[in-house]
């Protein structure tokens, strides 16, 4: 059944998985394997998770984490303001966090609402950032240096390194954490593939961010 209220008009059926990134702490059994893989580290931003997709007929659909939303919803209006709907082609989906005033206490103190794209899909297959449509990388979550944030040492070492991360979105403001997106063409063990699913990513949350914001 559809939840009452809001602008939900149907179930989530975009050509992608629902956004999800397990915490690294739940993947300790795969840490040695993860350290052999190439991954793009990106800043995790705290907003409202939204998916925009184009079906085979060229119709654009917008979704919250679990539901399709009305085409007049504020999520769609913001996506259109940034012309994300014009960047898609049939069978494609873009996933982004909507951030700014009035959303999640606007902890990054952004001056206006905006999207931060974190994943793009074509026919249920997540694609690397260098394959994204023109214009979309300009609206992406910040990418961090792959060498500086290479997966090394122990899980605890990595968690400690992320603790206190700040200033990658808004000067001097604590960042929520880091999400590592595995490059698409790598072979994963069956166990790790099952843990990550088609999203093929995982996160470390910044403990200082949680503490400061009472989360």
What residue ranges belong to the model's regions?
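Core nucleotide-handling region used for phosphoryl-transfer chemistry
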Residues: 1-215
